[in-house]
């Protein structure tokens, strides 16, 4: 079998966290990738964390299975700079780091969120439209509250397009759409047009119009955006933490607003999301056990 894929898709499956893979099938995907496999890692200098993960997993396996056993997989690094080392001592914060005034402020920042279920009914088209309407209403609340840069992050490109259609023609706001399906050139142009209004560390001067950035999961990586408020569709816990990392990144606002939306049909006992599987529902249920939902780095407890 020859499989061509991305680092995210392969890495998540190898670690039993495959995107869109159910809990029951996660071991199957990990087993197929984790035994008798040759990884051809293209442009390894752009995928150093994945190369390090492969090497670390190999070392971990060797602790339990020494020499006569062959390696579980091979790796060919296709790059002009293929040097990848594995640090046996992972990076952590020490006591001095935690008392540093800048870092301490960011670690202790509060990012409270409201859990808001969205009642949907009818056929799939009607349910998607109803959810998009709820997202627009939540974002409009943020704008009325004074937020000048609002992130709206949802799980599907179709939802992004529906939200854009509902916002079309509004003269009181600017709207920018970002999805993983955009051509790199189009994405760069779109980001370039809004960069000074969303970059971390900017001067939050008054602007004529608020900006709504409507995006999919594409915003979770490689985007140094800093929103004043956030509206997000519920997802897995790790995905939500990434999204909240785009909210008041430097703790300059002190108090922020965020809403987590979930379709009612995604919360049923048999609900199995095409992207996040049962993790979406499990995350929603776990968040409901908290007295206060706060996605600040040091404020969100670790689930059992």
Model-derived features with residue positions:
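Conserved RecA-like ASCE P-loop NTPase motor core of nucleic-acid helicases/translocases
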Residues: 77, 148-155, 178
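Conserved two-lobed SF2 helicase motor
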Residues: 1-15, 202-220
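Conserved helicase ATPase core of P-loop NTP-dependent helicases/translocases
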Residues: 183-215
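C-terminal helicase lobe and adjacent C-terminal extensions/tails of nucleic-acid helicase motors
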Residues: 137-140, 147, 162, 166-196, ...
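A short beta-strand element within the Helicase C-terminal
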Residues: 214, 219-234, 256-260
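SF2 helicase catalytic motif II
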Residues: 8-67
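Interdomain hinge/linker at the junction between the two RecA-like core domains of SF2 helicases
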Residues: 68-74, 78-143
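Structural recognition of the conserved hydrophobic beta-strand(s) that form the central parallel beta-sheet
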Residues: 3-6, 40-41, 72-80, 212-216, ...
